[in-house]
Each structure stands twice: as C-alpha cells, then as structure tokens.
Amino acid sequence: MAEAWFETVAIAQQRAKRRLPKSVYSSLIAASEKGITVADNVAAFSELGFAPHVIGATDKRDLSTTVMGQEVSLPVIISPTGVQAVDPGGEVAVARAAAARGTVMGLSSFASKPIEEVIAANPKTFFQVYWQGGRDALAERVERARQAGAVGLVVTTDWTFSHGRDWGSPKIPEEMNLKTILRLSPEAITRPRWLWKFAKTLRPPDLRVPNQGRRGEPGPPFFAAYGEWMATPPPTWEDIGWLRELWGGPFMLKGVMRVDDAKRAVDAGVSAISVSNHGGNNLDGTPASIRALPAVSAAVGDQVEVLLDGGIRRGSDVVKAVALGARAVMIGRAYLWGLAANGQAGVENVLDILRGGIDSALMGLGHASVHDLSPADILVPTGFIRDLGVPSRRDV
C-alpha cells in the first residue's frame, strides 16, 4: 500500500482528479463565477512570510488546543461539506479519520450519511445547518442533532446561489436511478477504481440528504432540499439569536468576513465565528478569508473563538492563520481530495501532512506551542489586510 500514501495535499488533488469521474471531480473544485475568490484564498497565503528564530527551538512541540469546548490534537477541524459521494464511506469514513487523528468532525445538513452513524464514528461532531425551511423545520433538525449527541451547532451564512461559473456548474443528477446510471456510465467506466468501490457495496452514490428528514427515513433528494433553501428568506439577526437560544450549547456562525458583522455576532451570543467565504462559492470578488482575519480577530478579541476556512493546503498555512488570530482552521477540499484518493486512510494522510507542516513551522519559529504564535511571527505585506465593515476616516 506504499503507493497509496501521498506527500502533499497537491498530490492528493492530482490523484482525486485521476480517480474520480469528471463530473464528480468538478463538484470539488467548483467556485463562483470567474473563480477570483477561490484563487485568492490559496494565493494569499503565499504573500505572507515568516520571521524565524535560529536559536531556541524546542525538541517537542504542543499542537493541541480546544474548539468550542472540544479538545483537539491540532488546530485543524473538519469543515462540513455536502454529499460526499467521492467514496462509499462518505462522512462516516471522514468522521473515523478525524477521530483517529484527534479532531472534530463537522457534519453538513446536506450530508449523505445519517447523523447518528457519524456521531457513532466520532462523538466530537458539530452539526451544521443553513437557514432553510423556517423556524419549525430548523427546530426539528436541531432537536434530532441534540438527540443524536452533537456537541456543537454550526450555522452557515456564507453560501449564495451562483448564477454562472466560467468552467460550468457541476452536473449533479437529481436522483441516482437506472436512467441516471446509464447516462453517466460512459464517464464512470473510465474511472474503474471509483466504480469498483461502489460496485462492491451494491449501492450507487447516495444523493439524498437523510439529516433533513426524520430518523430512519431516507430524507429528501439533494435538489429538493436545495430548492427549499433557495425559497427560504435569509435569516435576520433576531433569527440567529433565536436559533442560538434554541440550541443552548456551543454555537458557531460561519461566514463572517466583516468587522461589523463579527461584533453583531458577539452581541447575538455566539460561541465562535468562522471567517469564511464558503471556499469561493459565495460572492465572487470577496477577498481571501486570511486577508479579513486580522481585522475581525482584533475587533472581537477574546469575546468569541475565531476560526478560519478557505485556502488551507499546508501546515504552514495553518500556522499563519493561528498567528494572525485564529483559534483553529477548518478544511474542506483538502480532506475531500484525500477521501477520493484513498478513503479514510487518505483523510488521515491529509491530517498527518498538516500536522507535520505545523510542527515544522513551529520549530522554525522557535515556539513550543501553537499558543505561542503571534502576529510578530508573520511578515504581512503593506495592503494585505482587508478591514471590511470598518468605517472609513471620512465616515467617523
């Protein structure tokens, strides 16, 4: 199995591209419109440098931290992503990998596996919801998550409908039936490893979302749930406060890019915020999340935990984010490429890559712990930071 191991996230992406049908792979790299934001999410990290210490490195480094009360062995958690049809194990395989590496699993309400199965694989699971279907529907969804044992709730606000992608939108079928299988077979048959994995289970990729129905039921098709989300009016801050109170436990608001929104989130009583542009799948032209992080972190201080997602490909990226104010980062595409490349072991491989990179960067900076990191460790070029939602001088 030596050939199954990969050295970098970039290699995992290459293997995912080789092993997945084109339409499945395209769903992993898809982003809004021109893809300006998704490209900037990655490129922005390369603009940041380090200020290393040549003397004083310790022989052992502590990467552990906590996220919304959950102890994690490294400052990386799994971001919730929908319908993980890249591997038959899907979200359960990812949850097991996260548990094996000592971190939190984020489970999407658009996931293909029931929350009960995922929490059985990893008790440290945060359940994610969109503002979809109104208060009554959300109350049912949240109560099921509570009964299943979810230890945190994530509310995603940074996803809007993209009206055009220059490379084309992913061709996701409405449901997986015989007609669909026959239509996709010419594409799938060119990827025998992927096809054989599903053939062994005697089940095609599941495009239903079981966590949007009652326990034990298959749930609605993906696009039925997606349509309900599109038809639901966006939430108000009062809605966010209501949902936080309803949940009554650790509560993260995902998608905060502006200082004024971050302050409103604090007022709403959230436990954590994630600086995020939904991996470039929101409003194209939004700055990279790492550019917005320093201003948001400075604005809220220690009133709430601040996380970041978007563009994480290396352990050094994680270190840059933590130094600039993040408690931890959330990864999405990186672990999905690992899942496609080698199932659960591939996700563990990705987490190991990030762990090794974090450790190496800490050593180079002369720090014994991720908690020792600060902005002084990072070279930030002039004009890099985007302080969105801050009144300009002429407005003051």
Swiss-Prot record:
It comes from the Bacteria. The keyword Acyltransferase does not apply. Its EC number is 1.4.3.26. One of its GO terms (molecular function) is FMN binding. Pfam families: FMN_dh. Keywords: Flavoprotein, FMN, Oxidoreductase. FMN binds at S108, Q128, T156, K254, D309, G310, G311, I312, R313, G332, R333. The keyword Oxidoreductase applies. It catalyses: 3-amino-5-[(4-hydroxyphenyl)methyl]-4,4-dimethyl-2-pyrrolidin-2-one + O2 + H2O = pre-mycofactocin + H2O2 + NH4(+). InterPro entries: Aldolase_TIM, Alpha-hydoxy_acid_DH_FMN, FMN-dep_DH, FMN_HAD, MftD. SUPFAM superfamilies: FMN-linked oxidoreductases. Gene3D superfamilies: Aldolase class I. One of its GO terms (cellular component) is plasma membrane. The active site is at H278. GO terms for biological process: mycofactocin biosynthetic process. Residues 1-383 form the FMN hydroxy acid dehydrogenase domain. Its cofactor is FMN. Involved in the biosynthesis of the enzyme cofactor mycofactocin (MFT). Catalyzes the oxidative deamination of AHDP (3-amino-5-[(4-hydroxyphenyl)methyl]-4,4-dimethyl-2-pyrrolidin-2-one), forming an alpha-keto amide moiety on the resulting molecule, which is called pre-mycofactocin (PMFT). This reaction occurs via a 5-[(4-hydroxyphenyl)methyl]-3-imino-4,4-dimethylpyrrolidin-2-one intermediate, which converts to PMFT. The alpha-keto amide moiety is the redox-active center for the redox activity of mycofactocin. PANTHER family: 2-HYDROXYACID OXIDASE 1, S -2-HYDROXY-ACID OXIDASE-RELATED. Belongs to the FMN-dependent alpha-hydroxy acid dehydrogenase family. This is Pre-mycofactocin synthase.
